[in-house]
Amino acid sequence: MDIKFESIEGKSFEYRVMMIVFAGFTVAGLLATWWVIQKGIWVTGMYSRAPWGLQIVMAVYYIGLSAGSLVISGLYGVFGKAEYKPFARIAVYIAMLFLIAGLLSIITDQGRMARIFIQPFVHFNLQSMFSINPILYIGHIFICLVYLWALFYEKKTLTKVVATLAFGWAFCVHTGTGAIFGFGARMLYESPLLPASFVAAAMASGTALMIIMIVMLFKLTNRIVDDELIIWLGRFLAICILVVLYFLLVENAY
C-alpha cells in the first residue's frame, strides 16, 4: 500500500475557525491557571472530603488519553498494518501532547510548583510510585519524540523498534498511574485489579479520542478516510468499553 502524506496549507475557512477555537481554549486555560494560582487550589473543588481537585482528575484523564492514543499507533508500528499508517503520526503526536497536559495539570496542583522538578529525582525511592512515575512520564515523552522522528523520516527498522518500546511503555505509564490510587477506600482499590482497570479505561478513552480526531480532521481538510478503518476502531472501542464495564461491575458488586 503506497501512502503519501501532504501538508495542510492552512488557508481554508474551516482551518482558520479551528485555530481560533483552539486559541480561545488556550487563553481560557491560561486565565484559569492564573486564577487558581492567585486564589488557591481550593477553587478546583478540593475540601476536607475531596482531597483531589479538578487538576488531579484531569491529569489522570489526560494521561489515560495519552497512553490509549499511543496504543492505536502500534497497529502500524508494531503489527505492521499499513492501512493504519495515516493515523500513526497523529496518534503519537496526540499522545505526547496529552501527557504534557497531564503533567502541567499536576504542576498547577502543587503548592510549591518548583519542588516538582527537584524532589522526585533528588529523593528517589524505588518503592514509591510517586518517584517511579516521573521517570515513566519523561521517558514516555522522549520515546514519542523519537517515534515521531522515525515516522516522519520513514525509518522502518527504527519505527518497528521504537513502536514496540512505546507500546509496552504506554501500558507501564498508565499502570503506574493506577498504582498511585491503590489505597484502601473501596474493595477494587485494595486489589491489583486497579492498575488493570486504569489501562482498560485508557485504551477506551484513547481510542474514542482518536476516532473523533481522525474523523474531524479529515472532514475539515476535505480528505477521504476509509470507513472500514473507523468501523474497526469502533469495534475495538466497544471491546474496551465492555472491559471497563466489567471492572465497574466488579467494583460496585460489594
Positions of the model-derived regions?
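Membrane helical hairpin/interfacial module
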Residues: 50-115, 132, 136
